[in-house]
A protein has these predicted regions:
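Conserved adenylate-forming
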Residues: 70-75, 196-210, 214-256, 278, ...
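AMP-dependent adenylate-forming
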Residues: 9-13, 32-55
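Conserved AMP-binding/adenylation subdomain of ANL enzymes
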Residues: 235-253, 261-304, 316-317
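Gly/Ser/Thr-rich phosphate-binding loop
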Residues: 300-305, 314-381, 392
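AMP-binding/adenylate-forming catalytic core of the ANL superfamily
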Residues: 112, 129-131, 303, 416, ...
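ANL superfamily adenylate-forming
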Residues: 12, 141-208
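Conserved ATP/PPi-binding loop(s) of AMP-dependent carboxylate-activating enzymes
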Residues: 386-390, 402-435, 475, 570-572
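Conserved AMP-binding/adenylate-forming core of the ANL superfamily
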Residues: 43-88, 92-96, 113-118
Length: 629
């Protein structure tokens, strides 16, 4: 009996019909798996960008051209190449070309600050990088401090249709910085491809277990780290995604809005599609209006995104009248989907002709992305679903490997074929996160709080470190957010803990109201009264602050840490102001005391002087009364 067979798996009876408990996984590299699709579906559309479609056969030619050029500039097996790009053809082709030559793709957000880019380049040990012309100044500045032998600079225009290219160069492209010709170590996209024209086709046959990509995440400790993932990790995910969506057919369209530097975007929206004959519609930049228009125009079969993406769609008029009967799968992940938002978006889908509901998933970058998904035919309110085939979950007492009973909260642990190789340059954190349990399996300790019911459905609560402790009670922000989001006034909410000298932390809520509602004291009182009816006294918000919008992370999650930092900054400023006032008070008190002392001293001196004068007068009088001989 295998080790995995000994693990409790109550979810097996909750699988959709046709979804197997175990799968057979490709032993090829990621690129090798894509090559299989090229042979099977050469004339199918692999990706589409700004109205320009590229078949699998043509995509393969582009990947080969990139691979030859990578060889020409000296990239070899095991080298790291940073890809700092939005979703664009160059990003996709370069990613698979890097894989083809046996190198490792280091995926970085193009809006990263200079200091962050420098960190990513140093941390990964990258020997080359590719970015857009509009981000060139950041890299040029960084190159002075970081040893980066080669920088490839491309433009959106490089992959546009001729007319669109002209239009782009006359409008948005005019604002982009010009790349100096002949700059040492800097190549334009055209020059980069020219370098490989006379190089033989170059492909390194890598194994499934070989490293393929580095994705950055806060990890289970909250500190940014590179997560090293293998070919098997990505290929296993692609197989699991298709297995849990048995309706999928080659040629189905995925609107790829999630970025390729994120596990959700790279693993689900891109690789799971091109590794199975899917059609990716590449979206380089998100706005609610353009996203709504793209859905109406392209009629995708699949969309995947974070909750804020779905929340944004509910607010834009551009989606009105859209026929969404084309949708076969809508997936939410990357952040907690509130019960209320799911209800609203499910109703929205139904109103627009879709016969499906949002399926929530859960995952961590330590396992590429999703490892758990709500089944099609059985959903439970508040649940993030059941584990993928060959993936196992258990809930343990935090800080231990001790499994807790069904229905009891603890730390979510998981194991399966998508589990990372390691944290780059962080062996201690790797050992803390990947732990071998008594069952002999290696488990990822996620740092997330959750629960499993008797049917194997998983319920995510929140990050363990996000838990608020007030007066000794544990308060879970996500639960309070679910309650607040259920009020008819509330569009979106975020709950945080604020430092308190007596309670340790107090609860504060931030609320974005729905259109038509005004943030008045009466409105705040209505929400506070609502909270009193639905929230335990110890968990009640001490304050509700209205915002027009909430801060978001680079991938669209609500950035609760930004709100925490803002509140901490206010407290620090208040503490500094109080300290200043206290110092002023102390100074005034010292000055008052000094003045009192001075007055006392002066009075004493005057009294002494008066006494001495009086005594002198007495002596003089006495002397005057004494008869002279």
């Amino acid at each position: 009996m295998s080790k995995a067979a000994q693990v409790k798996a109550p979810w097996l009876n909750s699988r959709d019909p046709g979804v197997p408990a175990t799968l057979t996984y490709s032993e090829l590299s990621m690129c090798g798996r894509v090559e299989e699709m090229v042979r099977r579906y050469p004339d199918y559309i692999a990706y589409e960008f700004m109205g320009k479609c590229t078949t699998y056969a043509d995509m393969w030619k582009k990947i080969n051209a990139c691979a030859k050029s990578l060889k020409a500039i000296g990239i070899r097996e095991g080298d790291k190449v940073t890809i700092c790009m939005p979703n664009a053809p160059q990003t996709l082709c370069m990613f698979y070309a890097v894989n083809m030559v046996g190198a490792i793709a280091n995926m970085v957000h193009p809006l990263s600050a200079e200091s962050e880019i420098a960190f990513y380049l140093r941390d990964s040990g990258s020997v080359a990088a590719i970015t857009l012309d509009q981000f060139y100044p950041k890299f040029e500045s960084v190159r002075k401090a970081v040893d980066l032998p080669c920088l490839i600079v491309t433009s959106v225009a490089d992959e546009l249709k001729p007319l669109l290219k002209v239009g782009y160069k006359l409008t948005k492209g005019r604002k982009n910085p010009k790349i100096p010709a002949g700059r040492a170590g800097v190549l334009s996209w055209k020059e980069f491809l020219r370098r490989g024209e006379y190089v033989e086709i170059y492909q390194v046959r890598r194994k499934a277990e070989d490293p393929a990509a580095i994705l950055y995440s806060g990890g289970t400790t909250g500190v940014t780290k590179g997560i090293l993932l293998s070919n098997r990790n990505f290929n296993a995910l692609a197989a699991q995604i298709i297995a849990t969506n048995p309706f999928f057919r080659p040629g189905h369209k995925m609107l790829a809005i999630m970025p390729m530097f994120h596990g959700f975007g790279l693993g689900v929206s891109i690789h799971s599609m091109v590794a199975n004959g899917g059609h990716c519609i590449l979206i380089p930049r998100f706005t609610p209006q353009s996203y709504a228009e793209l859905i109406k125009k392209h009629q995708p079969n699949l969309i995947a995104g974070v909750p804020s993406l779905f929340e944004a769609l509910l607010r834009v008029k551009e989606i009105e009248g859209a026929d969404l009967s084309c949708l076969l799968g809508v997936f939410s992940g990357g952040d907690s989907l509130s019960v209320e938002l799911k209800k609203r978006f499910d109703a929205f889908l139904k109103e627009h002709g879709a016969s499906i509901t949002v399926r929530e998933g859960y995952g961590t970058t330590e396992c590429v992305t999703a490892s758990c998904l709500t089944p099609i035919h059985k959903q439970k309110e508040g649940s993030i679903g059941i584990p993928f085939p060959d993936t196992y979950y258990k809930i343990v007492k935090p800080g231990t490997q001790e499994e807790v009973p069904y229905g009891e909260e603890g730390e979510i642990c998981l194991t399966g074929p998508t589990m990372m190789l390691e944290y780059v340059n962080h062996p201690e954190e790797t050992a803390q996160t990947k732990q071998t349990h008594a069952d002999g399996l290696t488990w990822v300790h996620t740092g997330d709080l959750g629960m499993m019911d008797e049917e194997g459905f998983i319920y995510f609560r929140q990050r363990i470190k996000r838990m608020i402790v007030t007066n000794g009670y544990n308060v879970y922000p996500s639960q309070l957010e679910n309650i607040l989001d259920g009020h008819e006034y509330v569009h979106l909410s975020c709950v945080i803990g604020v430092k308190d000298p007596i309670k340790m932390q107090r609860v504060k809520a931030f609320v974005v109201l729905k259109p038509g509602y005004v943030p008045t004291e009466a409105c705040k009182q209505e929400l506070m009264d609502y909270c009193r009816k639905h929230i335990a006294k110890y968990a009640m918000p001490s304050d509700i602050e209205f915002r027009e919008e909430l801060p978001k992370t680079l991938v669209g999650k609500v950035a609760y840490r930004v709100l925490e930092e803002e509140e901490n900054a206010k407290l620090d400023a208040k503490a500094a102001e109080n300290a200043k006032i206290d110092a002023q008070r102390r100074q005034l008190e010292e000055e008052r005391k000094a003045a009192v002392q001075e007055r006392k001293a002066k009075k004493a001196a005057e009294a002494k002087e008066a006494k001495e004068a009086k005594e002198a007068a007495k002596e003089a009088a006495k002397e005057a009364e004494t008869p002279k001989e």
